[in-house]
C-alpha cells in the first residue's frame, strides 16, 4: 500500500479528449454499481460510484478527463442489453490511454466479462490511441465493449494472440460509422464464438481485418460481418470448410461486389456462410473504387520504356493496356472492383522514367502487389514499383501486401504526392537495400500514422525523404536500428508539421549525414530524442532540427570529440530553444557553423568544464545566454 503523503505514480490513465461540450455520465444497471476516480484537466482526483441515472460530469470542448479504477470487472453480462457500469452522456470524445488503469493496473485480465459494455452507446469518436494491452484474453472480456457507439470511426488495435470463448463477441456491433479497424486479428487459434457478431451492422466498413487462423471452431465467425453493407474485401487463411457450424450468416448483407482472398485454400462454398455471392476470388492486386471516375495508366516520359498490365472486372476476361505519355483511361463506378496483373520485372527504369496509375477515381488498393511481377516471390530488379501510385487518388493501402524482400529504389516515390492516402501498407522487410524507401510517402498530406519499420540494420539512403512533407503525420514509427549508414534518415520527417514527439534514436556510433535534416521544419516538435552517440561522423546532425520553432530544450550532446560539420545549422531557427548541453572539448567553426542562429534571446548553455574556447554568437554560444559548467549527476 502506498504510504500516506506519497505521490501516486503517474500512469497512462484512460483519457477522454472532449470534442464537443456536454456531459460524460458514469451509469449502471440495477445492482451493478462500480466506483472509479476521475480528474478533469489534471486537477484533483474525485471518486464516483455509478448510479442508474448516471453521475454527470460537465465538460467543455478541449477538456481532458482521466479515469482509473480498482475493479476486476464492470458488471456487464453476456446479453446485448446487459450493461453493468458504463460511460454515457452527450459529449463526444476521443478515448486514449491504457485500459489496464481501469483494472487496478493489472498485467493480466482479472475476470471474465472484465470490460464488457464499458462504452455501450457512448459518444466516443476515435479509440485509435486506446491501448488494450492484454495478449491473453478471458471469456467475454470485451463483449459488446463499444456496442451501439454510432459515432465511433476508428477502433483500437487488438494485439491479443491467445483468445477465449466470446472474447470479442459483438465488440463493435452497431458502430455504423466505423471505417478503420486493425488490418489484422493476429490470433491463429480460435475459440468458440470468439469473433461472433464482432462487426455486426458496421455499415461503413469496407475492408475486413486479415484472419490468419487456419482452423475454425464453433461459431467463431458467426455473423461476424452481418449487414456490413459496404464491405468489399476479406482475406482469410482457414482450410476448414465454412458452414453453419463455424461461419453462419457471417457475410449476410455485405456489398454486391467484392474481393475474397482465400490464400489458396481449396474449399468451395459460396453464399452467406462462405464467399459472398457475386464476389471475385483473387489474391493479387485489386482496386476497390470508392468514388466514380477514371483509372489511368501513363508513361511519365516519352524516353521511358512502356509497360503493360492487364485488368479484369469479372475475374475471367482480362484486358491488356500499355502505358504511353497520353494516358490509357478506363471509367469505373463507385463499388466496382478491378483486378490487376502483369509480367514485368520493373515498372520504372529511373526516378524520372516510370509508368504509374492515376485518374479521377478514388480507390483503395488491396491484395498482393506481386501479381504485377507475375507472382514472383521476390523483387528482382531496381525501381520495381517506383512511382507506381504517384499523385493518384488512392485512399487506403492498409491491405496492400508488399514482399519481405527489397531491392535498390524498389519503392522509390511509390506513393509520392498521394494527398488522399490515409493509411499505409505494412513494410515487413528487415533486410533493406539502398534507397529502397526513398521518398516513398513524400507529400502524402493526409497520412496520420506511419507504418512500423522493423529493420535494425540501415543501408545507404534507405529512409531518405520517406515521410517528407507528410503534414498530418502525428506519430512517427519506432527506429530501433543501432547500425546506421550514410544518409539513412536524411530528410526523413522534414516538414512533418503535426509531429510533436520524435522516436528514440538508440545508435551510439553514427554514419555520414545519418540524421541530416531529419526533423527540419517540424514546427510542432516539442520534445527531441536523446542522442547518446559519442562517436560522431561528418554532417551526422547537420540541420537536424532546423526550423523546429516549438523546441525549447536541446537533447544533451555527450560527444567530447566532434566531426566535420557534425552540428552545422543543427538548431538554426529554433526560436523557442533556450537550453543546450554540449560536452565538446574542442571545436572549429565548421563543426558548429550557425548551429544556434535565431534561437531564444536568453537561455542557458551548459558546457564541458575543460572547454574554454567557445566564441559568442550563432556559431558558438548565443549572445545573452548564461554559461554553466556541466556537473555529473
Where in the sequence are the language-model features?
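Solvent-exposed loop and capping/linker segments of extracellular ligand-binding repeat ectodomains
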Residues: 4-633
